[in-house]
């Protein structure tokens, strides 16, 4: 394991982070409802990134951890992340499907119908620990996409 390092942070880092968050929130609001097909495409592109760059990801992890075996990196970070992405892709349409609920009085008598429509909450920040850096980002990202 490497020794801790002090990292200098410029004074305007918080301002830059706030600006980035505001830009992401504005983009989310502008995009509106995202279809299952769009979300599946995003998951597929994330899987593609992991597959295409698996060796580079493993090399970077190896540099950080000073000798973690290549196969372990591929299994714990890359393959585990791809598995989570595939699981979400497989179940996404079912998870997004609206659910019927009984309408309360008097709406039920008047022909009213009640449904729950699942929607994304907005911009999500994922904070990951250092020990499995790729898996701890991409696994929750699968659900966020």
Where do the PLM segments sit?
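Conserved small-residue-rich beta-alpha loop and adjacent elements
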Residues: 104-145
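N-terminal Rossmann-like NAD(P)+-binding subdomain of aldehyde/semialdehyde dehydrogenases
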Residues: 1-113
């Amino acid at each position: 394991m490497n020794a801790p390092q002090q990292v200098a942070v410029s004074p305007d880092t918080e301002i830059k982070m706030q600006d980035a968050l505001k830009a992401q929130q504005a983009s989310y609001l502008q995009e509106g409802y995202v279809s299952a097909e769009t979300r599946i495409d995003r998951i597929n592109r994330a899987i593609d990134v992991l597959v295409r760059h698996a060796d580079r990801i493993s090399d970077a992890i190896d540099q950080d951890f000073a000798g973690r075996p290549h196969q372990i990196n591929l299994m714990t970070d890359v393959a585990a992340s791809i598995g989570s992405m595939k699981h979400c892709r497989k179940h996404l349409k079912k998870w997004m499907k609206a659910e019927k609920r009984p309408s309360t009085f008097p709406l039920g008598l008047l022909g009213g119908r009640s449904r729950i429509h699942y929607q994304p909450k907005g911009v999500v920040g994922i904070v990951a620990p250092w020990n499995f850096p790729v898996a701890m980002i991409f696994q929750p990202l699968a659900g966020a996409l």
